[in-house]
């Protein structure tokens, strides 16, 4: 079984007052609150979501 590469994403800023699409993107990434960290598979779709809300999250490879 092949180990897939993962990426850790942490929400740094609040989603209050942000664009509805950006709030939905955070929800899609599984982020719920400030300092919440999730580990996701490193795929092009996940990277695209991260790029959309780059100013609210921190990414660790």
UniProtKB/Swiss-Prot annotation:
What are the recorded GO MF terms, alphabetically? structural constituent of ribosome
- Please give the InterPro entries that the UniProt record associates with this protein: Ribo_uL30_ferredoxin-like_sf, Ribosomal_uL30_bac-type, Ribosomal_uL30_CS, Ribosomal_uL30_ferredoxin-like
Q: Which Pfam families has this protein been placed in?
A: Ribosomal_L30
UniProt keyword terms in alphabetical order: Ribonucleoprotein, Ribosomal protein
GO terms for biological process? Answer: translation
The reply to whether DNA-binding figures as a keyword in the UniProt entry is: no
Entry's family note: Belongs to the universal ribosomal protein uL30 family.
**PANTHER family recorded for this chain?**
LARGE RIBOSOMAL SUBUNIT PROTEIN UL30M, MITOCHONDRIAL RIBOSOMAL PROTEIN L30
Q: What name appears for this protein in its UniProt entry?
A: Large ribosomal subunit protein uL30
> What organism does this protein naturally occur in?
Colwellia psychrerythraea (strain 34H / ATCC BAA-681) (Vibrio psychroerythus)
């Amino acid at each position: 079984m092949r180990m897939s590469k993962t990426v850790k994403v942490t929400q740094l800023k609040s989603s209050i007052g942000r664009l509805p699409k950006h709030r939905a993107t955070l929800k899609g990434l599984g982020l719920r609150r400030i300092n919440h960290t999730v580990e996701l598979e490193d795929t092009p779709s996940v990277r695209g979501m991260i790029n959309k809300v780059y100013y609210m999250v921190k990414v660790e490879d």
